[in-house]
């Protein structure tokens, strides 16, 4: 009987990508098959996120729930990876001594040998080092699960924003070689993938070396990926405004496979707060980039990230953020109350803003962002959208669902499963708060 793997993933798309590669790796080296039930597993993997305090607390809550499983089955291996593992290392076992393996984002390729060593020696295995991009040399070709796929093009970040743990948990920026990324995309396309999302913590900082020694940027990579037979749609995330270049704007204008949607985190509309965050740009510079992009690609959808309640944020600072939202007209975006992360410079800043006021500001900001996003959805009613059909609707098995270029879910009545994995033209009939409804055009 095949041994079972249970994997739980917290956090960003990069973690989702890493988790899929762990499944590939352990399937090839240890013949582990994925199970949906932790109690049936021989190996449990928790891929963690440390971007906010609540996410970190969630890790230990989940590990606590698995403690009884480990007591009932001492042969079970529990492994913790991702950014919490990278940040805390062996200290994880101080709170959860039944954890067998602790590994970082850059050492996931060592999982098979670490699991074997834990079983043989009965000793904990810990490796949270940063061996640059070495892990990709040890991973098998990715399996394909649906028409969309993530492709990691770079790891880490060298921006050192004062609130962010990424440089400390994933290391400095390192780009994958250009040809390695291209080979992965070709493999995915040959196995039915139609849409790829190029991933990096600062993806527009990509600088990949080609086989002839040249250095290619993200715009170069996008143009070559677009030429791969079978790839009809390209996304990328997450970007930094400082490196949103003219060449990338030109790619948006000239490459039809590149979607008319950009996620460009700004974090705040206050120049004073942006300086304290060490974002190294102003709101004027941010808006200038977007004006240039919208001139090149009319109708492009812009989403962003916002942090409310950064230490020292005044009412005027928050008002400036709300003004930026009005000036730009964002699509649905992500926003959070600031969460101090240990080891980051911002964690040492004085913070005298009451928590209740932070939550009040967040609610106001989210309300306006949702209004703007819903207005964009309503403007799409009556239009014909080309969507990539991804699966059956989660609520109605008589419906299929897919995504538009601007990343909206569309549900439409259709009982033809052969449409899954294909593009279809759908007339948008109605806008709902978090999705669209449409009719398939024959």
From Swiss-Prot:
Q: Which domain of life is it from?
A: Bacteria
Q: Where would I find the Radical SAM core domain in this sequence?
A: 143-375
Question: Which residue range or ranges hold the TRAM domain?
Answer: 378-442
Q: How is the cofactor bound?
A: Binds 2 [4Fe-4S] clusters. One cluster is coordinated with 3 cysteines and an exchangeable S-adenosyl-L-methionine.
Q: Name one Pfam family in it.
A: Radical_SAM
InterPro entries listed in its UniProt record: Elp3/MiaA/NifB-like_rSAM, Methylthiotransferase, Methylthiotransferase_CS, Methylthiotransferase_N, Methylthiotransferase_N_sf, MiaB_methiolase, rSAM, rSAM_horseshoe
Residues binding [4Fe-4S] cluster 2: 157, 161, 164
Q: What does the UniProt entry say about where the protein is found?
A: Cytoplasm
Q: Which CDD domains match?
A: Radical_SAM
Its name, as the record gives it, is tRNA-2-methylthio-N(6)-dimethylallyladenosine synthase
Q: Which UniProt keywords apply?
A: 4Fe-4S, Cytoplasm, Iron, Iron-sulfur, Metal-binding, S-adenosyl-L-methionine, Transferase, tRNA processing
Q: Which SMART domains match?
A: Elp3
Report the GO terms under cellular component: cytosol
Gene that this sequence comes from: miaB
Names of required cofactors: [4Fe-4S] cluster
Q: Which residues bind [4Fe-4S] cluster 1?
A: 12, 49, 83
Recorded GO MF terms: 4 iron, 4 sulfur cluster binding; metal ion binding; N6-isopentenyladenosine methylthiotransferase activity
Similarity comment: Belongs to the methylthiotransferase family. MiaB subfamily.
Quaternary form? Monomer.
Q: What class of enzyme is it?
A: transferase
Q: Where is the MTTase N-terminal domain?
A: 3-120
């Amino acid at each position: 009987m095949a041994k079972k793997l249970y994997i739980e993933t917290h956090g960003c798309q990069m973690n989702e990508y890493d988790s899929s590669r762990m499944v590939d790796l352990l399937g090839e080296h240890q013949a582990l098959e994925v199970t949906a039930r932790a109690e049936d597993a021989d190996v449990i993997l928790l891929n963690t996120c440390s971007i906010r305090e609540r996410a970190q607390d969630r890790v230990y809550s989940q590990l606590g729930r698995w403690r009884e499983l480990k007591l009932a089955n001492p042969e079970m291996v529990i492994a913790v990876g991702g950014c919490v593992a990278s940040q805390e290392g062996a200290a994880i076992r101080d709170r959860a001594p039944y954890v067998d393996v602790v590994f970082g984002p850059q050492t996931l390729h060592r999982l098979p040998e670490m699991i074997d060593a834990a079983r043989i020696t009965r000793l904990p295995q810990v490796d949270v080092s940063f061996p640059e991009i070495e892990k990709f040399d040890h991973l098998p070709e990715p399996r394909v699960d649906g028409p969309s796929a993530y492709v990691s093009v770079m790891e880490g970040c060298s921006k050192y924003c004062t609130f962010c743990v990424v440089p400390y948990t994933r290391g400095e920026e390192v780009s994958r070689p250009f040809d390695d990324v291209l080979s992965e995309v070709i493999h995915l396309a040959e196995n039915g993938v139609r849409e790829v999302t190029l991933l990096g913590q600062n993806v527009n900082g990509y600088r990949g070396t080609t086989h002839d020694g040249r250095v290619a940027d993200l715009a170069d990579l996008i143009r070559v990926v677009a030429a791969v037979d079978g790839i009809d749609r390209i996304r990328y995330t997450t970007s930094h405004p400082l490196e949103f270049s003219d060449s990338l704007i030109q790619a948006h204008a000239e490459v039809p496979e590149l979607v008319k949607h950009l996620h460009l985190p700004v974090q705040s509309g206050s120049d004073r707060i942006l300086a304290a965050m060490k974002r190294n740009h102003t709101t004027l510079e941010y808006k200038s980039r977007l004006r240039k992009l919208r001139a090149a690609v009319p109708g492009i959808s812009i989403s962003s990230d916002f942090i409310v309640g950064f230490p020292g944020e005044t009412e005027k600072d928050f008002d400036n953020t709300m003004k930026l939202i009005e000036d730009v007209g964002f699509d649905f975006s992500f926003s959070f109350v600031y969460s101090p992360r240990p080891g980051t410079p911002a964690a040492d800043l004085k913070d005298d803003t009451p928590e209740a006021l932070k939550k009040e500001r967040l609610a106001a900001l989210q309300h306006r962002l949702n209004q703007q996003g819903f207005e964009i959805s309503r403007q799409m009613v009556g239009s014909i959208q080309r969507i990539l059909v991804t699966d059956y609707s989660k609520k109605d098995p008589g419906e299929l669902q897919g995504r538009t270029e601007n990343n909206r879910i569309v549900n439409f009545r259709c009982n033809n499963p052969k449409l899954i994995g294909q593009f279809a033209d759908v007339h948008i009939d109605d806008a709902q708060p978090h999705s669209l409804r449409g009719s398939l055009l024959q």
